């Protein structure tokens, strides 16, 4: 649940909304147990994020949005500022290191998470030269991330995006790929490992990276360790939920990747980018035909 312009409502009122929403959610789940809707069996609490213009990272909750307002996260303006039509900053490997220190808790949650974005309807669409790199560094950034529609397809700022009406351009028509009718096939095996992606190379890249993040909580919340050049192990273990998750992320097309700090020998892994299945030997894996990234997770049946 996203609360717009959160600063204009007193934090205790937001907290009441959170409490009442959780109460209503639990009552609904109790009344619908065993029914057709799988959400009745979920355990997650009502989730709330807030927008406060210009707010940035605040993992210790210095602004009180978590403790006094009940928010789980706040939208992070660090990479796309407050100026209309302004330029954007893009995350990098150094951003991963910085954000892992704030949000890579390894267990549980930070006091106040961030929801990081690079494009906004209020300011500008972030369109650096390499949109694949943007997908890599945003979708694998620790903490929460938000993909504004069309980031994944390099949607253009047009249809009303003149200097006198910039916001119309940031809300331009979606540039759906030519094979959009195949979307059901793209999503068919997202819980295990998808085998079909868009023929649009940029979108396919964002799909692979985003699905890897979807399957692995360690990507956004795991404790990060740099185990080799451009190679990171992220681990998340939470006794309360029973989650025990680890991934290795390698930026580059190298065929041999060190994983020993994250996975034991003889562990079977899958590379979410190339689709290959590999087995750890001598603390390493060898990818037969690596892509632009190596995204390693436990093999899923």
List the predicted regions and their residue ranges.
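Histidine-centered active-site/metal-ligand motif
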Residues: 121-122
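Active-site-proximal helices and loops of the catalytic beta/alpha 8
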Residues: 5-117, 126-130, 134-141, 153-276, ...
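Substrate-gating cap/lid region and adjacent catalytic-acid/histidine neighborhood
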Residues: 145
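Active-site neighborhood of phospho(di)ester-bond hydrolases with catalytic His/Asp-centered motifs
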Residues: 148-151
């Amino acid at each position: 649940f996203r609360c717009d312009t959160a600063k204009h409502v007193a934090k205790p009122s937001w907290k009441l909304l959170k409490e009442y929403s959780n109460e209503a959610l639990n009552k609904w789940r109790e009344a619908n147990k065993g029914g057709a809707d799988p959400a009745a069996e979920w355990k997650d609490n009502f989730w709330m994020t807030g927008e406060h213009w210009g707010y940035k990272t605040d993992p210790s909750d210095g602004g009180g949005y978590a403790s006094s307002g009940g928010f789980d996260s706040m939208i992070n303006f660090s990479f796309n500022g407050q100026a209309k039509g302004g330029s954007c900053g893009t995350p990098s490997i150094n951003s991963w290191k910085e954000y892992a220190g704030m949000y890579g808790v390894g267990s549980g949650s930070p006091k106040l998470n961030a929801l990081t974005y690079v494009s906004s309807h209020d300011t500008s669409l972030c369109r650096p030269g390499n949109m694949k790199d943007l997908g890599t560094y945003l979708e694998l950034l620790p903490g929460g991330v938000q993909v504004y529609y069309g980031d994944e397809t390099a949607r253009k700022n047009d249809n009303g995006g003149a200097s006198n009406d910039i916001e119309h351009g940031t809300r331009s028509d979606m540039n759906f790929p030519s094979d959009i009718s195949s979307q059901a096939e793209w999503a068919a095996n997202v819980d295990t490992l998808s085998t079909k992606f868009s023929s649009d190379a940029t979108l396919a890249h964002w799909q692979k990276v985003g699905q890897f993040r979807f399957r692995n909580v360690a990507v956004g919340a795991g404790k990060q360790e740099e185990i080799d050049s451009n190679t990171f192990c992220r681990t998340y273990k939470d006794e309360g939920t029973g989650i025990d998750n680890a991934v290795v992320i390698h930026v580059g097309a190298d065929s041999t990747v060190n994983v020993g700090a994250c996975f034991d020998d003889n562990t079977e892994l899958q590379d979410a980018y190339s689709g290959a299945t590999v087995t750890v030997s001598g603390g390493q894996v060898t990818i037969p035909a690596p892509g632009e990234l190596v995204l390693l997770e436990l093999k899923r049946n």
